[in-house]
Amino acid sequence: GGGKGLFWNTRVKDIKKGRKYRGQWTIPKNNKKEESVWEGLGIMEFPDGSRYEGMTKNSLFHGKGRMTHSNGDIYQGEWVEGKACGKGVFIDQQGSMYEGEWKNDAYHGKGTEQWNHNTIVYTGDFVDGQKTGKGKFEFDGNMYQGDFVDGKFHGRGKYYFAESGKIYEGDFRENNMDGKGR
């Protein structure tokens, strides 16, 4: 449990893990500093060069925050008990992007994923980081709209062929048209 207020500490090193935290802490009722926890606004620097800036609670990232990984990947959004959870945006160093809902550090719920400078776009449902449910996938002018399972066209769907202008509507199995369709 926390105390009656917060104090700001500018230089605190977590020797065990080599992390450095600057920010707000609780003041425990008994004034034993070793029982205080990060609570409020803070900055955490990791030994690999990664950096978190944002809200903390019970010594975990909690609330709105931004994690910049040492490789240049960035997540900005909501955190719950140390994990990306809620609404957020992830951008990797190649320019790929995901914007949408998160749960337990994974894409989960409704979202949009874009690759190759926006030339490939998926908009739809995600479950535990995988494209699963209903969605739309656009690439090279072609488009698939329908059911996805684990990132593949699987179930009922419609495929628009950009070059011929033809449309296949019917069943799909593991990214392939299955049956006659129409």
Functional labels for PLM-detected ranges:
Residues 1-182:
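Intrinsically disordered, low-complexity repeat tracts enriched in Gly/Pro/Ser/Thr and acidic residues
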